[in-house]
Amino acid sequence: MQTMTSRSMTGHSRFTSTPCGERCRTIARVVLAAAVMAGGFVSTEEAHAAPLMAGAAKVDITNVEAGPVNDPLFVKALVIKSDTTTALIISVDAVAIGEIGHIKNDYLPKVRSRIEKELNIKPTNVLINASHCHGVVCSDVDERTFQAVKLASQNMVAVHVGVGSGHEDRIMENRRLKLKNGREVDVRHAYSMPADEEVAEVGPVDPEIGLLRLDRADGPKAGQTLAVVYNFACHPIQGVPNGGNTADVTGFASKVIEDNLSDGTIALFVQGCGGDINPIMYKDVEHPRSAEPLGNLLGLSALKGLRKVQCKSDERLRVINETLTLPRADVAERIVAMEAEQTRLLKSLKGTSLNLKTFLPLVVKYNLSDEFPSYYSHRYLHDKKLGRDDLGKLDADNRRNMKAYMDNIYTMEELTRVQTNLALLLKHQAQNVAAGKRTIDVEVAGLRIGDLTLITFPGELTVRIGLNIKQKSPHKKTFVAGYTNGYIYYAPTAEQLLNVGGAQEDSDCILAPEWQALFEAKAAEILKKL
């Protein structure tokens, strides 16, 4: 929000001397003083609008009936108000805002409607972001969301605003692998990895932690931090050793932040463009899966950045919420091609002499000694002196049988990838046909708080899209949040959608490739308005 100020009027009169002399100058000074006292003129230094008001709260939303609980899940609310605008950020420890997981599709309209009715906050000014952790929330999550918002709105205080960045590149990796044959696959527990020698390169990550800090502006707690909003791109799906319900990486990170700032600080995580970003060492089989060390690193890196943030009085607050129409995908031809590939792979499987019991010992032997795998070397030398090569022929047979067995394994691994992603394509093709139209309408929001600008989208944006928007933004501090105000599955780049059926991001998607240019153009348009 831009503040209108009057032209500066100082105590030094700018009236020039006239024939009326000192009497006129005296009258002018009296009139000027009266106008200032009446509020008709305000100096630049005195023209500051009232500081932003803010309130923050959190409510536990853990489903305690869904099995063992490792750590709590929360819904957190941050209400920010200027003289003319009220904005609301809600962060939910859940996989999505509707469509998948345990939050139903009526959650967003129900929560917004009640907030508007009872708290008079416009639905378009309500931004609800899912952390994308895979924890299980309680059945009355909508009621508890409203409770958090109400608590926040009842405890508003004047705040100073600071914006900055942190850096963290140790806890995540791009999960899309570019193969030497030009295709791409992804790193999932749903299927196995390609052979190491097939992998050519990996995609980028975004190490920036977007930071917003709100400090109390006055009163006995002046200077203490009321709330922090931090934005980062990574799937928080590492899990915990006991397999219990967890808010995962970002839940632990938020706890680190809250425990190390002022008493009562609320840390809201806003998921970024983490569609193709996994926790580091995601498929490690040597150690228990544990999100806590990764969350601790993220939290400490956020704190390091927060220490450098300077808060100041800044009344700028604006929300822009627009509807964007995007094209739906038609993958019917790709489905036919993948079904043909599925059949080809299945028919390529051949019978082998070996089974698992005989294959594994041979693999060990032939990898321990390439030249003399079947016995000690002297037996090979002995046979050679006698003109025999019995062990050599045995080795040739064993190597041929091992290769046949390995070929079947690689084929079966490829078959599982094809079948898993084909099922996703079939699901979304049916959804798009059932929709009855070739497009889908989505919410794209822009938020400005002081020096911070934020763009939101309801899909699982991949990291390159966030990097593009940040790079082209006219503002110094722009952040991007997927998983916000709804859920429309993955939203990969147009280039990634050339790989349809090869990885989850391009298979678990309802959008046509043209969507990316439309969204990035809309984001640029909104950023200019902010």
Predicted features and spans:
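Bacterial N-terminal signal peptides that target proteins for export
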Residues: 4-32, 43-44
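C-terminal segment of classical bacterial N-terminal signal peptides
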Residues: 37-46
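Charged, flexible cofactor/metal-binding loops and thiol motifs
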Residues: 299
